[in-house]
């Protein structure tokens, strides 16, 4: 019963502002359709000095248990139901059928970690990473899985691309606006 009053309050609050800034054109269209005025898109950028293919680390890949030439598939984020990690793990299973040398690396922590670790004992769980350590994890991967449908942007997509890692994601939010199919 609170949904409509809260939505009305937020709309009034934002409409009193000179502008409401959002990260994607899709979100701008959604808010405009709900009666928000002066909605402006400001795309986010990424730190390409930090997130770079130059941070690839063969020792880290070996620590993940990858054989030479193996395929490192990475997911970065909170290990929680809203991140749709079940789909990521099913996608990885399909990848592994084609590439038995593939290894799934999950960067992050959260309420699903224990259940995921039990269900996928071959996956590598590295916990939370930050700064240069996180950047090395991205750059040392070959493929980035981002199955979430709950993000308004998802900086991880830009971080993976800046690191030279191919992203696989839904045609949604930042992925829809930042990833191009050139094939």
Model-derived regions, located:
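Carbohydrate-associated surface elements
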Residues: 26, 45
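Aromatic "clamp/platform" in nucleotide-sugar-dependent glycosyltransferases that forms part
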Residues: 149
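Short alpha-helical donor nucleotide-sugar binding micro-motif in glycosyltransferases
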Residues: 14, 128-129, 136-141
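A short helix/loop element that forms part of the nucleotide-sugar donor recognition site in Leloir-type
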Residues: 52-66
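Conserved donor-binding/catalytic core segment of Leloir-type glycosyltransferases
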Residues: 67-83, 89-93
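Short hydrophobic beta-strand element within catalytic cores of glycosyltransferases
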Residues: 166-169
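Nucleotide-activated donor-binding/catalytic signature segment of Leloir-type glycosyltransferases, i.e.
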Residues: 114-132
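Membrane-proximal helix-turn-helix segments that form the acceptor-binding/catalytic region
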Residues: 3-19
């Amino acid at each position: 019963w609170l949904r409509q009053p809260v939505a009305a309050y937020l709309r009034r609050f934002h409409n009193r502002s000179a502008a409401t800034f959002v990260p994607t054109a899709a979100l701008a269209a959604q808010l405009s359709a709900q009666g928000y005025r002066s909605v402006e898109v400001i795309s986010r950028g990424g730190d390409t000095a930090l997130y770079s293919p130059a941070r690839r680390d063969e020792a880290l890949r070996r620590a993940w248990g990858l054989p030479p030439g193996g395929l490192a598939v990475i997911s970065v984020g909170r290990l929680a139901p809203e991140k749709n990690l079940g789909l990521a793990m099913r996608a990885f299973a399909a990848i592994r059928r084609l590439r038995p040398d593939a290894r799934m690396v999950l960067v992050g922590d959260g309420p699903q970690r224990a259940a995921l670790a039990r269900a996928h004992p071959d996956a590598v769980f590295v916990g939370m990473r930050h700064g240069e350590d996180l950047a090395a994890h991205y750059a040392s991967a070959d493929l980035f899985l981002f199955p979430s449908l709950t993000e308004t942007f998802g900086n991880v997509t830009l971080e993976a691309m800046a690191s030279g890692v191919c992203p696989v994601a839904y045609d949604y939010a930042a992925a829809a606006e930042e990833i191009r199919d050139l094939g």
